[in-house]
């Protein structure tokens, strides 16, 4: 039976590129040092660092804190550790027989050397007693910087406001927790500032103001201002990052906490009130400034508005010249051209109309364009012809809700409804009788009324009953 090696030897790879030629590897079974034999095999070839965890202490990089305080730190051990790290790197290609146990032993040696070089530093800031908590934790260099001319910078609100944790409210002097990893290099982040101390909640009303107090204002003790709670400052905070952050923020954010300087406005208001009349002073105090008490209001209003075009005949003004021209041409009654109004007269009769549309509607009464195909009767309106056709077909779509009578035209139904009402539309002037239709009133006045005549009767409404044209 041929093995894999025999098969590879038989094939000729002289003309095959090197990167495509098969490589023959020989692996040895690693020894299992774990207590549990059922765990999967760890095939990781990278360097593994096993760090001994100590739950009671946190390891902090000494170089991060000491460099900030001006303490010289010897970095020779760091170079030695880096050389050891380079020696411990496992080269799988050069020595394939090296086992995993040797790699773990080398990693443990590196971890022990790193743990020996790390020392937990003691805090360098003083312990303030309870009665001195109003003192500011900033250094003298910080005050010299902010007191320079043209650099009135307000400290961060996060430094002057108490933290939200309950431990700080009890007056704890421990520095904020640092989450540095074991053996972390100093080049990863800027050094931690040891003078940043969170203040307890009970000292919120004591705050330092680096800007001078302006004259003419009451003491800032009674001045209340809502503080904006900022996010807690990270351990990577430094003085350079503080000034870079303050320079990036606009000046309005810094000046928003200061009250507006209204001294000039108050002085001008007092001068105006003293020179004005007593009635104007009372109106200004109450806030009701009427147009009568402000003589200059109308003048300012006229200056701001564009000029208006006034009609010389009726004194009306318009914002545009086209509006004034249209007013003079059509609407102005005092204009010379509008004194004699246009009139449209009918050629067949003596009637006159103001508009041309009304004259055209009147001409239809003479021409009668709507004619019935059954009887040849003509009408001036199409709806009158439609009501006439219903008399031929017998259709009566309009019915009375009281007596169930039906009518072909709506006007006939409207006249019929008057018979059911107590008050009729048409009344006789002689006997005060009322009728639902004009024809009934005429019949009554001509033959039935004792003291009436044909000319004495009058009506208050038009007749809706007939279809015939006048």
Curated annotation (Swiss-Prot):
Residues 271-309, 448-470 are annotated as: Disordered. Its main location: nucleus. It comes from the Eukaryota. One of its GO terms (cellular component) is nucleus. It is found in: Nucleus. Pfam families: zf-C2H2. This is Protein escargot. It comes from Drosophila melanogaster.
């Amino acid at each position: 039976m041929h093995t894999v090696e025999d098969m590879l030897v038989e094939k000729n790879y002289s003309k095959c590129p090197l990167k495509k030629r098969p490589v023959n590897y020989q692996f040895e079974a690693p020894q299992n040092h774990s207590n549990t034999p059922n765990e999967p095999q760890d095939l990781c070839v990278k360097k593994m660092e096993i760090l001994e965890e100590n739950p009671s202490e946190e390891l902090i990089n000494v170089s991060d804190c000491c460099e900030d305080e001006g303490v010289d730190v010897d970095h020779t051990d760091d170079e030695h550790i880096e050389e050891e790290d380079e020696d411990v790197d496992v080269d799988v290609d050069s020595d394939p027989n090296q086992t995993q146990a040797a790699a773990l032993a080398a990693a443990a040696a590196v971890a022990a050397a790193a743990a020996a070089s790390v020392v937990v530093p003691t805090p360098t800031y003083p312990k303030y007693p309870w009665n001195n908590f109003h003192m500011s934790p900033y250094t003298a260099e910080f005050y010299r910087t902010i007191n320079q001319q043209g650099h009135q910078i307000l400290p961060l609100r996060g430094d002057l406001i108490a933290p939200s944790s309950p431990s700080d409210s009890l007056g704890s002097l421990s520095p904020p927790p640092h989450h540095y990893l074991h053996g972390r290099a100093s080049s990863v982040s800027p050094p931690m500032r040891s003078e940043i101390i969170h203040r307890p909640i009970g000292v919120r009303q004591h705050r330092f103001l680096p800007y001078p107090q302006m004259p003419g204002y009451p003491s800032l003790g009674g001045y209340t201002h809502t503080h904006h709670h900022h996010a807690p400052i990270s351990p990577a905070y430094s003085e350079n990052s503080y000034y870079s952050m303050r320079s990036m923020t606009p000046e309005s954010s810094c000046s928003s906490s200061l009250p507006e300087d209204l001294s000039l406005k108050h002085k001008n208001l007092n001068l105006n009130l003293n020179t004005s009349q007593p009635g104007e002073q009372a109106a200004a105090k109450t806030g009701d400034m009427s147009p009568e008490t402000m003589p200059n209001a109308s003048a300012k209003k006229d200056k701001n508005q564009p000029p208006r075009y006034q009609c010389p005949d009726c004194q009306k003004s318009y914002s545009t010249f086209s509006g004034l021209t249209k007013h003079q041409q059509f609407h102005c009654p005092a204009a010379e051209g509008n004194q004699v109004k246009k009139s449209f007269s009918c050629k067949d009769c003596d009637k006159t109309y103001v508009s041309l549309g009304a004259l055209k509607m009147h001409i239809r009464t003479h021409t009668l364009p709507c004619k019935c195909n059954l009887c040849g009767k003509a009408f001036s309106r199409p709806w009158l012809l439609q009501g006439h056709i219903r008399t031929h077909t017998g259709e009566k779509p309009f019915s009375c809700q009281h007596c169930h009578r039906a009518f072909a035209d709506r006007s006939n139904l409207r006249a019929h409804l008057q018979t059911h009402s107590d008050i009729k539309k048409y009344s006789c002037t002689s006997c005060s009788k009322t009728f639902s239709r004009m024809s009934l009133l005429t019949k009554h006045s001509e033959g039935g009324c004792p003291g009436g005549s044909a000319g004495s009767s009058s009506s208050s409404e038009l007749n809706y009953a007939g279809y015939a044209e006048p």
